[in-house]
């Protein structure tokens, strides 16, 4: 009894193990027979049409998976896409009932007729650009081929508002040899499929639409499909590492006039800022394309600051010259200078005035100079009185000389202090002037770019 049960169990498991393999072999044999039947006498160089005046209708669509790079310097856009191509090949039809219910097969794309659709604006010499993957052939003759492709397409860059710019890059697809009478392109979907798109860290795709067009050549019409990609740069990186440092450098230029006028580091600070701006300008030159048509926004701003800093150096040298003026350097102060810079402007600039601190002293008194008498008087009380008078006259002359000398030194010191105060007033004037120009220049330069950056793109035309 035990042996009988073991035998039945072994027979049952053998049947289960053998049956799927037989069915698999049968399915493979049927698919092999189908392929032999379909491709017997099949010529992949011949268009799949029954009449010469018929055209092959190719449904075309684009799916983007990644925006790899946008090279502004070389004006290239690198993308990874899938090309959706679908057409009818009447020579590849069969009845599924005759082949075990097989409704579709996968065949190498090299063995069937393909529409030679290429990217016209290809920039790396590989116009086909796609991988020769297998195509899906259905029993009704409908062929679907979706090869992945990596393209480097030419794109004219407009860097006017860099780094707040938007670019319009296009990809034009069409048949290389077939005109519109042989191959008719049909746009599957106006919008590019972005369901599996991998975000780019620098660019954002605002819109990606396709439109059908045609070009005329020797009385023949060649259809094509153009996909336009509206790209917006994400400016955070350039704002943090380019624009904000430039704003800081311009602010340092303004602070030069807040330093004391006798500081020799004022010119050194302005010169260091000018060198830093030159380095930033060289960095931008490595990024943007070398074009004389437009000047990028950040380039305009850097040139503005460089002119700004150069003027500040010139003004600083003038202020230092004023600071070191005195009567000893043969720079007497004019009355209008004294009235303007020592009386009027300090009140307008909220500075403590330096007015009426001194008057021009009379270095030579109008009183007659008393000269000592050398006459010797007669001896006695009168002679002693005359000697005392002479001694007093000599002492008076000495005191008068010392007084004149002190007044002169005081006058020179006051003149020096007045010129220093004039230099302070000039510093305060240029501080507010340069601060106003810096703020207004920054606003005027960046406002159009910010308006364009924040503007919502128009909806695509149907």
UniProtKB/Swiss-Prot annotation:
Coiled coil feature spans: none
Disulfide bonds: 155-169
Spans within the Extracellular topological domain: 31-234
Primary residence: membrane
Protein localization: Postsynaptic cell membrane; Cell membrane
TM region(s), chain numbering: 235-259, 267-284, 301-322, 429-446
Database matches in Gene3D superfamilies: Neurotransmitter-gated ion-channel ligand-binding domain, Neurotransmitter-gated ion-channel transmembrane domain
Residues listed as glycosylation sites in the UniProt record: 53, 168
GO cellular component: postsynaptic membrane
Region (Disordered): 362-384
Domain of life: Eukaryota
Chain intervals with Basic and acidic residues compositional bias: 362-372
InterPro entries: Neur_chan_lig-bd (IPR006202), Neur_chan_lig-bd_sf (IPR036734), Neur_channel (IPR006201), Neuro-gated_channel_TM_sf (IPR036719), Neuro_actylchol_rec (IPR038050), Neurotrans-gated_channel_TM (IPR006029), Neurotransmitter_ion_chnl_CS (IPR018000), Nicotinic_acetylcholine_rcpt (IPR002394)
CDD domains: LGIC_TM_nAChR
Position of the signal peptide: 1-30
The entry's keywords: Cell membrane, Disulfide bond, Glycoprotein, Ion channel, Ion transport, Ligand-gated ion channel, Membrane, Postsynaptic cell membrane, Receptor, Signal, Synapse, Transmembrane, Transmembrane helix, Transport
Bilayer disposition of the protein: Multi-pass membrane protein
Segments in the Cytoplasmic topological domain: 323-428
Reported function: After binding acetylcholine, the AChR responds by an extensive change in conformation that affects all subunits and leads to opening of an ion-conducting channel across the plasma membrane.
Family matches, as PANTHER family: NEUROTRANSMITTER GATED ION CHANNEL
Subunit structure of this chain's protein: Neuronal AChR seems to be composed of two different type of subunits: alpha and beta.
Family designation: Belongs to the ligand-gated ion channel (TC 1.A.9) family. Acetylcholine receptor (TC 1.A.9.1) subfamily.
Name of the protein in question: Neuronal acetylcholine receptor subunit non-alpha-2
Native organism taxonomy: Eukaryota, Metazoa, Chordata, Craniata, Vertebrata
């Amino acid at each position: 009894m035990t042996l009988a049960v073991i035998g039945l169990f072994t027979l049952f498991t053998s049947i289960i193990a053998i049956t799927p393999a037989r069915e698999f072999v049968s399915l493979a044999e049927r698919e092999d027979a189908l392929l032999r039947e379909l491709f017997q006498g099949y010529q992949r160089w011949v268009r799949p049409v029954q009449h010469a005046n018929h055209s092959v209708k190719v449904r075309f669509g684009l799916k983007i998976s990644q925006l790899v790079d946008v090279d502004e310097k070389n004006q290239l856009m690198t993308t990874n896409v899938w090309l959706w191509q679908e057409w009818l090949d009447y020579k590849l039809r069969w009845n599924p009932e005759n082949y075990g219910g097989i409704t579709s097969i996968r065949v190498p794309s090299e063995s069937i007729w393909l529409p030679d659709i290429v990217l016209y604006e290809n920039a790396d010499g590989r116009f086909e650009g796609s991988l020769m993957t297998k195509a899906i052939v259905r029993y009704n003759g409908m062929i679907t081929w979706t090869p992945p492709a990596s393209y480097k397409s030419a794109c004219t860059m407009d860097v006017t508002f860099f780094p707040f710019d938007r670019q319009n890059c296009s990809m034009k697809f069409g048949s290389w040899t077939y005109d519109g009478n042989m191959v008719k392109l049909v746009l599957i979907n106006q919008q590019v499929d972005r369901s599996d798109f991998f975000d780019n860290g620098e660019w954002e795709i605002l819109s990606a639409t396709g439109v059908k067009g045609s070009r005329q050549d020797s009385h023949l019409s060649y259809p094509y499909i153009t996909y336009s990609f509206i790209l917006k740069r994400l400016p955070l990186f350039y704002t943090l590492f380019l624009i904000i440092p430039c704003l800081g450098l311009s602010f340092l230029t303004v602070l030069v006039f807040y330093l004391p006028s006798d500081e020799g580091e004022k010119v050194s600070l302005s010169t260091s800022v000018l060198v830093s701006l030159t380095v930033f300008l060289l960095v931008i030159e490595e990024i943007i394309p070398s074009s004389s048509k437009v000047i990028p926004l950040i380039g305009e701003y850097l040139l503005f600051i460089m002119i700004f800093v150069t003027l500040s150096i010139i003004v600083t040298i003038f202020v230092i010259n004023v600071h070191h003026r005195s009567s000893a350097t043969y720079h007497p102060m004019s009355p209008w200078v004294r009235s303007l810079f020592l009386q009027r402007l300090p009140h307008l600039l909220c500075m403590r005035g330096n007015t009426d601190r001194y008057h021009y002293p009379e270095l030579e008194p109008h009183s007659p100079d008393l000269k000592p008498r050398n006459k010797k008087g007669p001896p006695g009380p009168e002679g002693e009185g005359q000697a005392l008078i002479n001694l007093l006259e000599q002492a008076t002359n000495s005191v008068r000389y010392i007084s004149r000398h002190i007044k002169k030194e005081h006058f020179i010191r006051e003149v020096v202090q007045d010129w220093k105060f004039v230099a302070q007033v000039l510093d305060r004037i240029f501080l507010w002037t340069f601060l106003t120009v810096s703020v207004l220049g920054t606003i005027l330069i960046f406002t159009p770019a910010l308006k364009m950056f924040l503007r919502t793109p128009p909806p695509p035309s149907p």
